[in-house]
Design a protein with these regions (language model features):
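Structural beta-alpha unit
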Residues: 2-4, 82-119, 157-158
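Short, hinge-like loop/turn segments at secondary-structure boundaries
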Residues: 52-56, 111-113, 137-138
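Short, solvent-exposed amphipathic alpha-helices that sit
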Residues: 25, 72-81, 106
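Small/aliphatic-rich secondary-structure junction motif
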Residues: 2-63, 90-93
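A short acidic, glycine-rich active-site loop
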Residues: 58-76
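Solvent-exposed polar/charged
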Residues: 28, 112-113, 143
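Glycine-rich, Arg-bearing micro-motifs that act as flexible, cationic patches
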Residues: 118-144, 154, 158
Length: 158
């Protein structure tokens, strides 16, 4: 990171309280920064592949329509995140990315294409078994991204 200027930040946003909190913390740490708010969406084929029993019922022309709906919802979530970021004093644009393999790979690809210098993500407290099986986005980004990562923990309960 350059020390003369505020970095361009890729801010991962999924609509959760954790992601909203990450926007607030980012605004406090980097007032007026340029952020690219990213939501990653999953194509229907990926969902069907996980639940093979659904395949006979969801084929044909339903998949493109469902994907269009998923992409529209993703764009809407990214817009929501960008709006929150702007309200927090950041210079924000909304972006969505179609998942092709894993969420972390989509985030890394977007960080490159959008010229980000820092990735920010909220974190969730997953149980040990859940984290072992599923993993976390922040952990995967730490392992695979060449960019610095700022993982914002969830706020402590009152």
């Amino acid at each position: 990171l350059s020390t003369d200027a505020t970095p361009t930040i890729l801010l991962c946003y999924d609509g959760s309280e954790h992601a909203t909190h990450a926007i607030s913390v980012t605004a406090a740490l980097f007032p007026g920064a340029t952020v690219k708010v990213l939501h990653v969406w999953e194509p229907v084929e990926h969902i069907i592949a996980r639940y093979a029993v659904l395949a006979p019922y969801l084929g044909g022309e339903l998949i493109p329509a469902a994907d269009a709906g998923a992409e529209e919802q993703s764009d809407s979530l990214a817009d929501e995140g960008a709006k929150l970021a702007k309200q927090a004093g950041l210079i924000a644009t909304a972006h969505s990315a179609k998942l092709s393999t894993t969420v972390w790979e989509a985030v890394v690809a977007a960080s490159t294409s959008l010229g980000a210098q820092l990735i920010v993500t909220g974190t969730r407290s997953l149980s040990g078994v859940h984290e072992l099986v599923v993993g976390t986005l922040s952990h995967s980004l730490l392992q695979h991204s060449e960019l610095p990562l700022l993982a914002i923990p969830a706020p402590l309960p009152d």
